[in-house]
Amino acid sequence: MNFNKRFASVHNVDVLLGHENYDYKTSGISGLRIGQAFENIYQFSNFGTINSLGSSFSASRSEGFFSRVNYDYNGKYLLSASFRRDGNSKFPTDLRWANFWSIGLGWSLEKESFFASVPWVDQLKLRASYGVTGNSNTGNYPYQAGYDIGWDDDTRPGIILQSLGSPQLTWETQKPLDIGLDFGLFKNRLYGTLGYFYRNSSGLIFSVPQPLQNGGTPSGSFTVSQNIGEMVNKGLEAQISAVPVRGKNLNWTVTVNATRYTNELTKMPEATPALTSSPFKREVGKSIYEFYTRDYYGVDPQTGSALYKGVLNYSPTNSQLIKNKNGGFDTVTIDHNNARQDYVNKTSLPDVYGSFANSLSYKNFELGFVITYQIGGYVYDGVYASLMSTATNGGTYHTDILRRWQKPGDITDIPRLDNTRSSQFGATSDRFLTSATYFSINNVSLAYRLPKAFLSAINATSARFFISAENLHFFTKRNGMNVNGNFSGQTSDSYDAARVINAGISVNF
């Protein structure tokens, strides 16, 4: 429901009230039978033995009541306030409802009388906002213990405990502060926005490894979702557009935007001061995007074994001292389980990222392109790592495997192929950290608008020929499949975005 009203020619009020409700359900069924009786008949009845049957069901609900009030005084002073109450079935009954709000202020300075003598300023608006938002991005039943059914013997049904519940789990909350400046200068030949943001997140939901008495494992694979941390994100963002040429026949606009931000974990519980999940470690004072892993030293030229710098326990059977370039000695090991892990001074966060767009028109021709970029940051290229390990069962190698160690005396950074040592030679380490810097030609387009004289002859209001290309090329050092990673610092087994070329004509009558 929406209400807007203008009072006394200078007061403008807009009020919004709303309600939303979502019901999410997913289900699936699967089956496998073997022993085909007749060829080319794929119905279950044509197979003699049931190998497996399975099914799944999951559901969650969310509901929200929200409101928003916008007010401005003659377009000069602006106020915006919002409030919402949200509930989500992912949390315990007494913790699933929470209140969230925000307030924003704006001041259009160019409308003040003291700016009347500054004709080259078309827009100059200061704005700021602050509030509380919530995040429910977790599984559907994290607060409840989970059981896996179907563990039957010959005569009795059986179940096993699959996960422990987290009865105190609740919303993550974030308190965002935004301060910005919108400007337009020289008859809007130069315009854009500058901004600073600060996000204080609390009640972060982490998967916490459980102690052995809770069913935990030495590897830490048994976890429970808990609200245990606080984190700060802060940074700067800018978008600036310029119009170098503005005329009757020729127009040219250039837009550049850039964002830079930092991240720091500011609080962890005393009982769990650090969480290690290779290749990261979560602890106070560090970024959750900072890599924590083994230091890959190279390859032993005599044996072809992978070497890792720093050992937990020195052993002559798997450790050795190697003289370094500075005349000192480095302690290395061939046993990845005995290799020390530490921060490697690399993060998945870029120094800066953004895009560059260009639009040029001359008479009836239009040309444009968009380039996105990221400068700095690293990614753990797990896809590349999988392509550099032993390719059993029909697996695939990366062409870099041709540079592997093959005989004593070979100098290379790729260890020998050895089925019995693949876990050691391909262990998680900074060997697979790759620069995430990239430049991408996202879009290029060319169009021609038919002149009015021709349009009148065919009784058309407009006609336009066009050709465009998307995802033309990625410039990157990445070696895995999909070269466009993300700030999580991990990769996935997915192909590059498809290169698409479109051409056509658009006519309106």
Regions found by a protein language model. Give the residues of each.
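Glycine-rich, aromatic-lined ligand/substrate-binding cores of catalytic
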Residues: 347-380
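Short, positively charged
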Residues: 44, 331-335, 420-422
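Extracellular/periplasmic, surface-exposed regions of secreted and cell-surface proteins
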Residues: 2-288, 428-509
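Extracytoplasmic gating/loop element in the C-terminal half of outer-membrane beta-barrel translocons
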Residues: 88, 374-464, 469
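Conserved small-residue
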Residues: 226, 232, 245-348, 388
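Short, flexible active-site loops
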Residues: 338-340, 352-353, 365, 424-432
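Active-site loop/lid in soluble adenylation, ligation, and acyl-transfer enzymes
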Residues: 2, 110, 345, 349-351
